[in-house]
């Protein structure tokens, strides 16, 4: 009888032991405030990060966040270096062939920023100017 009770209690204890939440590795690129940026304590912050944190929490996952360079973020995802992105990402047909996307949670348009007094009427007006852009973004001209 004692042995049966002991085995039953051991089985119950094993069933009641908390299971550690699975940790998902999430990549971001903290160069796009207010969506992804480093706060004054150099901690990743922003809407995309808060959104991913809450979704994973509600799904029962822990999150390991990595701030990575944008020009390698998709290669790292494809290589399995991380499980998902918490980064402002344009959904393109090419990217849809390689990755799954959530429903978009915000929209944005591309714009050219010029000093006051300079005017452009078309992309052709930019030919004689020096134009800067982040590597690997869809806004590259």
Which stretches of residues belong to each language-model region?
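Periplasmic-binding protein-like
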Residues: 30, 106-114
């Amino acid at each position: 009888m004692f042995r049966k009770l002991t085995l039953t209690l051991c089985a119950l204890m094993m069933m009641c032991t908390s299971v550690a939440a699975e940790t998902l590795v999430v990549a971001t690129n903290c160069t796009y405030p207010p969506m992804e940026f480093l706060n004054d304590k150099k901690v990743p912050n922003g809407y995309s990060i808060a959104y991913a944190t809450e979704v994973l929490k509600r799904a029962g996952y822990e999150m390991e966040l990595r701030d990575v360079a944008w020009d390698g973020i998709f290669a790292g995802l494809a290589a399995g270096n991380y499980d998902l992105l918490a980064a402002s990402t344009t959904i393109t047909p090419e990217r849809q062939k390689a990755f799954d996307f959530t429903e978009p949670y915000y929209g944005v348009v591309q714009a050219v920023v010029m000093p006051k007094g300079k005017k452009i009427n078309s992309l052709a007006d930019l030919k004689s100017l020096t134009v800067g852009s982040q590597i690997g973004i869809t806004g590259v001209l």
